[in-house]
């Protein structure tokens, strides 16, 4: 992120009880209230508030321009989802010009869109506020003993009719370098199954979440890992990956990876097979081991000849298994030693 950080900076703010008598974060609004000093010190015209459990790419400039053009005081990014998901999101009723007429937080019977009876207009949990309104509402909410101190449950519904509030249609957001007809990508990854599905999306020939747009690079930490390596080319002992993403430092030493997302410095030994799985950093897959439809946390060691994802009744006695059959294996505290690599 060096080039980015030459002009910008990031201040990580861990949860903390800043004021006497305060508890840990009681809701999304309280999380901002407990750090309100940072907003007041920066004194910006606008504050962008974004959830951390979603996967998407967004040109925030376009949403800010919409907010300014509408002379909005609060703007909610929204996207149509099937009505069966209404109970999972805040649902917006909006006028044709985008004015928010009502906000229903996680109601299964929330009204559908006027032009589409099968979908609701769901809040993405991303907001832009004009600072004066935001500060006023945060202070008022903190004093309200009947509030759950949450944007979706408390602040946004209370703003309807009191302040100019608009819904920004995320479907109109455009990323430089993407094809004109590219649909915006957004996934809520608040569940294990959703997290798994989002990773599996990356396997596509032309993934909906495009990691390869040179005009819109993903800013992330850079490491000094060597390139991934694939070794051995013998029957039953061929290092290869198909329809997969393989990160730096990973070595496929006679092992097969198919339809998977592999983290950094993973070792897949001879005869091992990893299919349709998400493997985090520093995992070690032993000889002839088989892993299918699983999420392996960092530093997991799969013993030789072990199987994961083939017998759910057995897996449930050892690991966590979701209703859809995704096996989640907890990591170990110690890292895999590079020197133990066996070929």
Question: Which role fits each region the language model picked out?
Answer:
Residues 132-133, 141-343:
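Left-handed beta-helix
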């Amino acid at each position: 992120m060096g080039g980015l950080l030459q002009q910008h900076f990031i201040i990580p703010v861990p949860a903390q009880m800043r004021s006497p008598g305060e508890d840990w974060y009681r809701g999304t609004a309280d999380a901002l209230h407990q750090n309100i000093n940072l907003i007041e010190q920066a004194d910006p015209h606008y504050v962008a508030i974004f959830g951390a459990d979603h996967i998407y790419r967004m040109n925030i400039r376009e949403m800010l321009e919409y907010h300014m053009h509408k002379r909005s005081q609060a703007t909610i990014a929204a996207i149509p989802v099937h009505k069966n998901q209404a109970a999972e999101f805040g649902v917006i009723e909006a006028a044709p010009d985008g004015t928010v007429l009502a906000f229903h937080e996680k109601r299964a019977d929330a009204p559908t869109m006027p032009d589409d009876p099968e979908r609701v207009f769901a809040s993405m949990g991303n907001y832009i506020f004009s600072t004066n309104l935001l500060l006023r509402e945060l202070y008022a909410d903190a004093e309200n003993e009947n509030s759950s101190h949450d944007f979706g449950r408390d602040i946004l519904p209370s703003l309807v009719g009191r302040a100019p509030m608009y819904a920004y249609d995320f479907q109109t957001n455009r990323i430089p370098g993407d094809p004109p007809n590219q649909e915006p990508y957004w996934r809520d990854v608040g569940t294990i199954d959703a997290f798994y599905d989002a990773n599996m999306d990356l396997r596509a020939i032309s993934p909906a979440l495009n990691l390869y747009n040179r005009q819109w690079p993903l800013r992330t930490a850079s490491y000094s890992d060597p390139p991934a390596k694939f070794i051995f080319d013998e029957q039953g002992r061929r290092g290869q990956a198909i329809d997969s993403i393989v990160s730096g430092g990973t070595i496929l030493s006679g092992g097969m990876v198919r339809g998977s997302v592999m983290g950094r410095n993973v070792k897949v030994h001879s005869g091992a097979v990893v299919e349709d799985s998400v493997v985090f950093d520093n995992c070690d897959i032993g000889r002839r081991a088989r892993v299918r439809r699983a999420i392996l946390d960092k530093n997991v060691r799969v013993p030789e000849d072990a199987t994961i994802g083939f017998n759910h009744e057995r897996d449930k006695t050892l690991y966590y298994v979701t209703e859809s059959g995704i096996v989640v294996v907890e990591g170990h505290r110690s890292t895999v030693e590079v020197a133990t690599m066996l070929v």
